[in-house]
Amino acid sequence: MPKKVGYKRIGVDFRYGDESVARFINAVMLDGKKAVATKIVYDAFAIIAEKLAGEDPLEVYRKAMSHIAPVVEVRSKRVGGATYQIPMEVKASRRGALAFRWLKIYAAKRGGRSMAEKLAAELMDAANEQGASVKKRDEVHRMADANKAFAHFRF
């Protein structure tokens, strides 16, 4: 049987010294263009620092991530010919990955401006518990709440 490979250790980003920011840069990256992704994220942080004078952009980012990351989600399980949506707790690593994905998707869907401006706007909205990515988290939580009756079918 093959040996199970562990997780790849991701270093910290060079400006903020934060592993979460480094993971977010990797999530924003397209086609292996890390320099472009890094510029987008750092420009978004600079826009946040400019618009919200006196607030640390890293704190705004952390607050936004805590408001976007889901605690529970529904997973499909087939039981006797019927498929049930079973609410499950989300692991910490998946929680962050979902938050990154939703933030990136809903920032990109905003109209008109550069990606850095759209990302900054979505981060600021998420920090204030608004924005499309927070709505997505609320929708996932609502689905889990609606299917609470099937929680005893856990995997």
From Swiss-Prot:
GO annotation, biological process:
translation
The molecular function terms of the Gene Ontology recorded here are:
rRNA binding; structural constituent of ribosome; tRNA binding
Q: Which HAMAP family match?
A: Ribosomal_uS7_B
The family line of this record is: Belongs to the universal ribosomal protein uS7 family.
Q: Which UniProt keywords apply?
A: Ribonucleoprotein, Ribosomal protein, RNA-binding, rRNA-binding, tRNA-binding
The terms describing its cellular component in GO are: small ribosomal subunit
Q: What is this protein called?
A: Small ribosomal subunit protein uS7
Which organism does this sequence originate in? Pelodictyon phaeoclathratiforme (strain DSM 5477 / BU-1)
Domain of life where this protein originates: Bacteria
Q: Gene3D superfamilies in the record, alphabetically? A: Ribosomal protein S7 domain
Q: Does the keyword Zinc apply?
A: no
